[in-house]
């Protein structure tokens, strides 16, 4: 995997350009369609528990050539969803894509609240 973030003058939102290679034989590597299906159907424990701060859809896939963009996509699902776009085959690795998350919501404030909600739901505070 290779990834890089660029510092750009935006108010909120971190964008990562990711290239990755699967450690699988060529005939076992997922297609772009399979990868997108995995992303769009992904749910985790916060969604299963329907926690208040959890995004309904934690990963949103965009098909436009110029997305994701911080100004347009950072607030997806209250700022808690990760938006992925520009998924394509990579001549060096297997695939590449751009991912965007809201740094002050998903990455800090609401992310911390979601962690606390998850700990409470799992009974972490019951014996304190």
Annotated model-derived regions:
Residues 1-94:
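C-terminal substrate-binding/catalytic lobe of Rossmann-fold NAD(P)-dependent oxidoreductases
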Residues 94-128:
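Generic C-terminus detector
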């Amino acid at each position: 995997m290779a990834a890089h973030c660029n510092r750009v003058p935006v108010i909120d939102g971190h964008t990562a350009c990711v290239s990755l290679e699967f450690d699988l034989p060529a005939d076992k590597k997922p297609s772009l369609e399979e990868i997108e299906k995995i992303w769009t159907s992904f749910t985790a424990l916060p969604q299963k528990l329907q926690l208040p701060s959890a995004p309904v859809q934690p990963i949103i896939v965009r098909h436009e050539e110029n997305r994701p963009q911080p100004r347009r996509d950072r607030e997806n699902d209250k700022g808690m969803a990760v938006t992925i776009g520009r998924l394509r085959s990579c001549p060096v690795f297997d695939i590449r894509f751009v991912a965007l998350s809201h740094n002050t919501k998903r990455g800090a404030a609401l992310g911390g609240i979601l962690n606390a909600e998850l700990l409470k739901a799992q009974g972490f505070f019951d014996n304190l």
